[in-house]
Amino acid sequence: MQPKNCTILKKSKQELFPCQTFILLTGKVKNTDSLFYQTVFRSCPLKYWLLQAGVSMLINRSDSTNLVVQARGLKFTNCSISQRTVLRQGLKRQSITTKESSCFLLWEELSKSEEVNSSLLFHTSWLMVTCCLKYIYMYDICTCFLFCAFVTSIFIETDYSIFFLLTASRGIAQF
């Protein structure tokens, strides 16, 4: 069911994103109604939301209002706060469904002429590494850095990808 007054952008080859910057969210579910996360926000309007399929979370907006979004491989744009009851699609307003220590990507729209701040790239890279290292007890450190290299090569810059690849290769060479 398509939300009223909302445009659903289906996945395509271009991904329909006007920018290359992403925000990494990390957090845990506590009392089933709050999601604590670390992120870096930019002073620009949030119009494009991309969450992992089937993930629901409570997002704190800059205007101190809450918007519950459930995304199933879809991107919602031009959806106002008042339409949150439509977007949640039958979920309780405070219901958050996710896995502990999971990573999620939240895309933020930037104007096409705006250049990506290097400090933002640094902070998002640091958050990504922090999130990746949450799995250090499940996977070895080399796997983590290989994962980071893969993600950075797609979403950020080649220099970051090379750094993670070199770090991972050094670790593999030691075994």
From Swiss-Prot:
It is a single-pass membrane protein. The chain crosses the membrane at residues 143-166. It is found in: Membrane. GO terms for cellular component: membrane. Induction: Highly induced during the diauxic shift or during carbon-limited growth, and also induced by mild heat stress. Keywords: Membrane, Stress response, Transmembrane, Transmembrane helix. Partially overlaps TKL2. This is Putative uncharacterized protein YBR116C. It comes from Saccharomyces cerevisiae (strain ATCC 204508 / S288c).
